[in-house]
Design a protein with these regions (language model features):
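A short, proline-enriched helix->beta-strand linker immediately N-terminal to the Walker B motif
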Residues: 76-80
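Conserved ABC ATPase "signature" region
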Residues: 36-53, 105
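Conserved ABC ATPase signature
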Residues: 57-61, 65
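Conserved ABC ATPase "signature" C-loop
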Residues: 136-137
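Non-catalytic connector elements of ABC transporters
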Residues: 173-234
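Catalytic Walker B motif of ABC-type/P-loop ATPase nucleotide-binding domains
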Residues: 82-86
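ABC-type ATPase nucleotide-binding domains, specifically the catalytic core motifs of the NBD
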Residues: 14-38, 47
C-alpha cells in the first residue's frame, strides 16, 4: 500500500458498489488511453472468468465474485508484487480450481511475484515456489511445497495438505497420509473397521490399529467390525 509496484488485496475488497465491474477494474488505468484501458480490462475479465459480468453493478455480485473483481483491479497496472489474503476464501469449489490455474498462470506469464496468505494447502501445493508455515506467530517450516508435503516436520504442517495419521508403527512414530495405507491380507498390522465415508472416487475408512485411530483410502467400502491387515507405504 502506498507503493506503485506493490498491490494488496484485502478480504474487505474496497470496491465501488454502484459502478460496473469493468469500471472497478479500470479505476486506476489512465483515461488518456481509452483503447488500451478497454483492452486491459477485457483481458483481466477473462483471467477472473467474468467477461459476461462486465456491465453488472458490483453491489449485485456475490462475495466470491466481488473477490475476483478486487484481484483483477489490483492487477490492472501490472504491479511487480501482489499480496493476496485468502484470495479464494469466498469462491465456490467448482469455480475455485479453474480460477486458481488461470490466475497463477497469468502471474507467471507476466512475471508478477505473488505472496498468498492462506489456510488452504491447495493454494500452495500446485502453484507456489516456496511455502512458509506459521504457527502461533512463529515460522516452523520454510521449503518448497513438494518437500513439505513429502517430508513434513510435524503434524501441523502435514495437516495443511490433507488428513494425516500420527501413528506408532513398529515402535516408530510416523506421519502417514490416508493414501499411503493399503489393505493387505498378508500384513501382520491388524486393524478393525469402525466407520466409512464415501468421498466420490474412493472411500475413507476409519479403523482402530493398536488402540490408535487410523484413516485410510480404499476403492470400496468395508463393513463395520471387519478385521483387516494394513500395509504402510514408505
Amino acid at each position: 500500500p502506498g507503493m506503485s509496484f506493490f498491490k494488496y488485496v484485502a478480504q474487505d475488497f474496497d470496491l465501488m458498489p454502484y459502478t460496473s465491474v469493468a469500471e472497478n477494474i479500470g479505476k486506476f488505468l489512465s483515461r488518456f488511453y481509452p483503447e488500451e484501458k478497454e483492452q486491459r480490462t477485457k483481458e483481466l475479465l477473462e483471467v477472473i472468468e467474468m467477461s459476461s459480468f462486465a456491465n453488472e453493478k458490483v453491489k449485485t455480485l456475490s462475495g466470491g465474485q466481488q473477490q475476483r473483481v478486487a484481484i483483477a483491479r489490483a492487477l490492472a497496472k501490472e504491479p511487480e508484487l501482489i499480496l493476496l489474503d485468502e484470495p479464494f476464501g469466498q469462491i465456490d469449489n467448482f469455480k475455485k480450481n479453474s480460477l486458481r490455474r488461470k490466475l497463477f498462470s497469468y502471474l507467471k506469464e507476466k512475471n508478477i511475484s505473488c505472496i498468498v496468505a492462506t489456510h488452504d494447502g491447495d493454494d500452495a501445493l500446485s502453484f507456489a515456489d516456496q511455502m512458509m508455515v506459521i504457527k502461533n506467530k512463529k515460522v516452523i517450516a520454510f521449503d518448497s511445497p513438494r518437500n513439505l508435503y513429502k517430508s513434513p516436520l510435524e503434524h501441523y504442517v502435514a495437516a495443511l495438505f490433507d488428513d494425516v495419521n500420527e501413528l506408532y508403527v513398529d515402535g516408530e512414530k510416523r506421519l502417514i497420509y490416508p493414501h499411503q495405507i493399503q489393505v493387505s491380507k498378508d500384513s501382520s498390522h491388524k486393524a478393525v473397521v469402525k466407520k466409512s465415508f464415501f468421498k466420490g472416487s474412493f472411500w475413507l475408512i476409519e479403523a482402530t490399529f493398536n488402540s490408535q485411530v487410523v484413516f485410510f483410502q480404499n476403492p470400496e467400502n468395508i463393513v463395520f467390525g471387519k478385521e483387516i491387515g494394513l500395509y504402510f507405504v514408505d
